[in-house]
Amino acid sequence: MIKEIKVAGIKLYNYNVFENLARIAKNLEANVFTTIEEIDMKTILLAKEDESVKEVLESLDVTVFSEAGVLDAIGEATILRRAEIERREFFLQFMKIVEHSGYTVYIIGKDQKEIAAVSQYLADEFSRMKVSGLVALDEIDGEDYGIINDINTLAPDIILSVLPSPIQEKFLKEYKPMLLAKIWYGVGKGKIAGTRLTIGAKIMKKFRKLELLRYVQEGKENEET
């Protein structure tokens, strides 16, 4: 398995669940702030159009693919990797570690509805998890510095972001140097709390996969010329 890949011109790490967890553990031991993000086809396509999103994705310490279609596009979706992605193996294993280690979690999202759903899910599935704070960007007036102050006052171990892209990437890019935490985990909007795809969303997912395949093919043709 290739550990560093290029998808539609974007350089990303391609490690399995246990390799990613080992990388995180090593950074924790060295007291190094670690950035993690779940990446799907929509995120890749956004990065094609937005240089700031691409910059953030390429700077991540750990990339977790949340759709097998990303690896399908470059022929790297093995049976094992596909199973990991479909079972959300990284998310579940990581959250179990967070819960059992007693790490504190700060949840940041765009709206109160998403925050409430995620909080309830974590309480149901990881009952011993310590949520030290939460915030919805839609409820904040003016600059985001109040959020940064709140985060740094609480000094959580994990910042769990359920912000949608590209808001998530732009927030991380702007405020990463200011954050007092051990780990930033950008899950993205709608990926927690058992959210199901609507028929319309399933159609869009197939469309994005076809578009991503086109970008990959164009990249190969450019390399050959």
Where on the chain are the PLM-derived regions?
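Short, flexible loop segments at boundaries between secondary-structure elements
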Residues: 137-142, 180-213
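A charged, well-structured terminal subsegment
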Residues: 213-225
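Proline-aspartate-enriched helix->loop->beta-strand connector
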Residues: 151-165, 181
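A short, gly/pro- and small-residue-rich
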Residues: 53-59, 169-191
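Short glycine-rich anion-binding loops that position phosphate/pyrophosphate groups of nucleotides
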Residues: 41-42, 69, 163-167, 190
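N-terminal nucleotide/polyanion-binding subdomain common to many enzyme families
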Residues: 1-83
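Structural motif
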Residues: 62, 104, 157-158
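Conserved beta-alpha
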Residues: 71-144, 150, 154, 225
